[in-house]
Every structure is written in C-alpha cells, then in structure tokens.
C-alpha cells in the first residue's frame, strides 16, 4: 500500500507544472488575449464611420499586425502551454474568420494564369499608373502592357496630364478592340477609361484636389452598363514621411524619440483625416448608383484603403461583390512602398456578374501601384 501511494504522488508531481512554467503560461495567455482584443477591435472598426470617430481609419490598418501577432502567440502557446491557449486562440481567430478571408482569400482551384475569352465575359483592369510611368520610354512599355492584357474595360487613375502624350496613348489603342477612350482631369489628377464598348456618358461624381471619382454609361451588347472609376482620397503621405516611418520600423531612424513620436502622430493624423473624406466620397458613389438602380455595375479603382476598412465595407454594402475576395488568391498587395505592403486597389461588381478570376500583377514595374484585374461572367442571358 505505501508503494502504491508513492506512485500516485509521483504521477501527480510529474503532471504539475513548475512555477516558472505556470508564470510563462499566464503571461502568454495574457499577451494572446490582448492581441485577440486588438484583432477584434480592428476588425469591428469597419462598421464605424470615420466622421464619427476618425481614428477608426488607423485601427483598420492595424488588422494585419494583430492578426500575425495572434497567430504567432497561438502557435507558441500550442507548443508549450496548449491547455491554456488552444481554445482562446481558436475563438479569437474564429470570430474574425470572415474578415481574415476578405484580407487574404484562398481559392486553390481557381487558375488566375490562363483564361479563355468568351462573349459571356468581361475582363476589367484597374491601374493607378502614376502618370503613366513618368517618362516616354516607360510610358510606351506601360501602354504596351495594358494592350497585352486584352481587357474589355481599363480604368486608370493618376493618368497622363500632358495633352500631347494623351493623344499618343489614344493612337496606340486606336487599332485595338478597346479603342473607346474618355478621360478628364487637371495637372493634379487624370482619371479615365479605355473601353471595348461605346461610351455614352461620362460624369464627375465627386472630386478633391488630386482625387476624383467618375461614372460612365457604356453601351454593352446586353444593354447599358454602369462603370464607376474611383480614386478615393489619398492619405497625403509625403516621401520623407514614408521614409522616416520605414527607418523607424527598421530601427534605423536617426531622429530622437520625441521627433519619432511627432512624426508618427502626423502620419496617423493624416490617415485619419483622409478616412473621413473617403466617407464623403462613398456617400456620393451611393447617390450615383441610386440614380442607376437596376443596371449592371462595375466599380473599381484606387481606394487608398485596405480590405479591412470602412470604405471597402461601405462599397460592399451597396450590394456589390468584391471580385478579389471571390476569385483572388493571397494578400494581393497592390501598393508596395518602403515598409508599406497593402491591397488598396479593388474591383467590385453587381449581382449581375460572377467573378471567376481576379489577380494583382505584382510583377508589373511601371508604377508605385500594381494593376488589379478580374474576369466577370454574366450570370443570366439578357431577356
């Protein structure tokens, strides 16, 4: 009997964690809980109009930070203290599953490299061209790239403002199927469309200095098609601001802590202010689409906002489908500059279409943005 009692105590001692292990588990669980809370707050920020609380524009940008932080802490927890962390991490990520999928969709059975064009499809390309590459040689290459996409609709933002260069671009597209061209703007911004379908009308929906949204009525063989080309309000971040932020993130900043803090506040303040202006632009888009209710819609452009943002959420709430979410793959970063890697260019469509392919071409070297494309299929034959 004594021997049996000793064996029981040995097993009990072996299963009891040491004080250090217990403290580590508690700290890890606490850190995981804080990261999950941040993840939930950033995910929920899409429901809040920045005009009510401007800092939600910054909270959405923090989503990937909290996401990767949560994943990292959860994996560490599963390796060392699984009993304390497995359920917590599962619940934390599960609650945000839809938002995570929007940020990084996975479609293993969709081939975005090959496509067979049919009359039942529309291929759309949206590209912030950074003034068509700035420089004639790169401009020629960029135009050649767009022609080679064999798209039915090309929407561009930050187009070429020089009238002579615009005429040259028009002449390049003249012998192609996409020879209908319409553009408008100033020295600060040119927004335009290149289409395989006749352009019935171009209308300015709303504009800010350097940003504008235009609506187009196209004559498609199936009937009138509405296209909205968006360049939502930019965050107005200058090159030095971005470089300073990059240096700080990489621990290479030569500024003192106070200067770093002031620069960070300036950066966040600009992002927050621009988010409120994007909200006003979404209102204008909603009013425009209400005027064309019942007609098929394609909406695309440079949103200057990520998949986890009020702008993107509001556009989707207008009854539009996010093509990249439905048929894209991975993060699809469309803007890569300094330490910033985000998808801020998007393509949406009305329920008249089904996206079957969507892709961000991360190899195109002509602009500070990457072009995004989508192939849309008409769901029903025209009655």
What is each of the regions a protein language model found here?
Residues 124-125, 155, 299:
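Residue-level marker for buried hydrophobic side chains located in beta-strands
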Residues 138, 142, 165, 169, ...:
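Stable alpha-helical elements in mature extracytoplasmic
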Residues 13-20:
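Cytosolic juxtamembrane amphipathic/interface segments immediately preceding
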Residues 3-6, 21-79, 86-92, 204, ...:
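Metal-dependent phosphoester-hydrolase catalytic domains
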Residues 1-4, 109:
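Short, aromatic- and cysteine-enriched interfacial helices/patches
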Residues 94-119, 131, 135-138, 147, ...:
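Structured beta-strand-rich core segments of catalytic domains in phosphoester-bond hydrolases
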Residues 127-129, 159, 232, 302-303, ...:
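Active-site metal-binding loops of divalent metal-dependent hydrolases
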Residues 126-139, 236-274:
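Acidic/histidine-rich helix-loop elements
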């Amino acid at each position: 009997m004594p021997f049996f009692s000793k064996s029981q105590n040995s097993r009990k001692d072996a299963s009891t964690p040491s004080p250090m292990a217990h403290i580590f588990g508690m700290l890890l669980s606490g850190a995981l809980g804080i990261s999950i809370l941040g993840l939930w707050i950033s995910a929920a920020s899409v429901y809040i109009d920045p005009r009510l609380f401007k800092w939600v524009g910054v909270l959405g940008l923090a989503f990937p930070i909290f996401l990767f932080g949560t994943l990292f802490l959860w994996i560490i927890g599963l390796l060392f203290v699984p009993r304390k962390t497995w359920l917590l991490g599962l619940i934390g990520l599960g609650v945000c599953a839809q938002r995570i999928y929007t940020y990084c969709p996975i479609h293993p059975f969709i081939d975005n490299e090959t496509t067979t064009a049919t009359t039942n499809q529309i291929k759309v390309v949206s590209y912030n061209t950074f003034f068509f590459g700035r420089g004639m040689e790169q401009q020629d290459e960029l135009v050649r790239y767009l022609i080679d996409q064999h798209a039915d609709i090309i929407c561009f933002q930050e187009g070429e403002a020089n009238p002579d260069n615009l005429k040259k671009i028009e002449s390049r597209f003249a012998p192609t199927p996409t020879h209908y061209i319409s553009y408008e703007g100033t020295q600060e911004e040119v927004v335009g469309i290149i289409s395989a379908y006749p352009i019935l009308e171009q209308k300015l929906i709303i504009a800010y200095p350097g940003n504008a949204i235009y609506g187009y009525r196209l004559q498609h063989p199936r009937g009138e098609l509405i296209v909205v080309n968006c360049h939502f309000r930019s965050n107005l971040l200058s090159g030095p601001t971005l470089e300073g932020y990059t240096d700080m993130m990489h621990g290479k900043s030569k500024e003192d802590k106070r200067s770093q803090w002031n620069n960070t506040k300036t950066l966040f303040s600009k992002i927050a202010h621009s988010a409120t202006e994007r909200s006003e632009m979404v209102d204008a888009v909603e009013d425009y689409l209400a005027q064309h209710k019942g007609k098929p819609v394609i909406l695309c452009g440079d949103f200057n906002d990520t998949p986890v943002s009020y702008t993107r959420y509001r556009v989707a709430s207008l009854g539009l489908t996010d093509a990249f979410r439905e048929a894209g793959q991975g993060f699809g970063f469309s803007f890569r500059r300094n330490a910033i890697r985000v998808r801020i260019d998007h393509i949406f469509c009305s329920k008249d279409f089904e996206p079957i392919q969507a892709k961000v071409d991360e190899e195109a070297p002509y602009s500070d943005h990457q072009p995004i494309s989508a192939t849309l299929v008409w769901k029903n034959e025209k009655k």
